Amino acid sequence: MLDTKFDELMDFPCAFPFKVVGDAHEALTDRVVAVVQKHAPGDYAPTTKASSKGSYYSITIRVTVTSKDHIETLYTELAAIEGVRRVL
């Protein structure tokens, strides 16, 4: 697992924003939502912005997380999506 201090800094459960940056592909948003649904089922409305040249998408999604481990799992799973460059 990751070595984070989320448990010291946050009160759970809480809404937590994830920003996923990846190659511009029409299915990227659907892949992000699918991973989030697997770990935190809910009704999500992510926002997607294209980079200035259109090469990358930035997807922001707010997820209700229940623990430090929950956040770390989501970071790991989102980073494993094909085409994802960064998870912030």
From Swiss-Prot:
Under the heading Gene3D superfamilies, the entry gives:
3.30.70.260
Q: Which Gene Ontology cellular component annotation is one that this UniProt entry carries?
A: cytosol
Q: Which Pfam families is this protein grouped with?
A: DUF493
What is the top-level taxon of the source organism? Bacteria
Please name the PANTHER family in this protein's record: UPF0250 PROTEIN YBED (PTHR38036:SF1)
Q: Which family does it belong to?
A: Belongs to the UPF0250 family.
Q: What is this protein called?
A: UPF0250 protein Sputw3181_1029
Species lineage: Bacteria, Pseudomonadati, Pseudomonadota, Gammaproteobacteria, Alteromonadales
